[in-house]
Amino acid sequence: MSEEVLTDLAPLAENRSIALNCAGDALVIGSDTLLYRLLFNLAENAIRYSRSGSTVNVSISDSDSHVLLRVKDEGPGIPKQYRESIFQPFFRLDKSRSRAYGGAGLGLALVWEIAALHGGTVEVETSSENGTTMLVSLPKRSAALTEQ
């Protein structure tokens, strides 16, 4: 699925002269449509906020019970005081970012909801003026599926 997302986002990345890299692979049992949207939203944000000519890295690693998905960009970073607020619908750091980068302010809220639906979490792992790494931890078997 990660290759499909990156293929779908390749035109946007090429338009912004951003290289897309993906490393790793793992299996998560859950909604393919929702998991696609989760990764798409994270990678699209990374492309949108990265500087032209930079790189967006997607890495997927596997543990016994969880899959860890990291999306690293080379954008302006997220100040510490906003690292939880960014997952709220329509939240914007400032209006100028909204005009400059576009979007409706729903992407990260959807990522949060999709991760939670699958029994996972999402957080800002690291962030500075040199970029941000978003970390999603998903159980290999979706909580939504095991409850049925």
Region annotations inferred by a language model:
Residues 11-25:
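Short conserved segments within the C-terminal catalytic ATPase subdomain
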Residues 46-47:
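Short helix-loop "hinge" at the ATP-lid/N-box region of the Bergerat-fold HATPase_c
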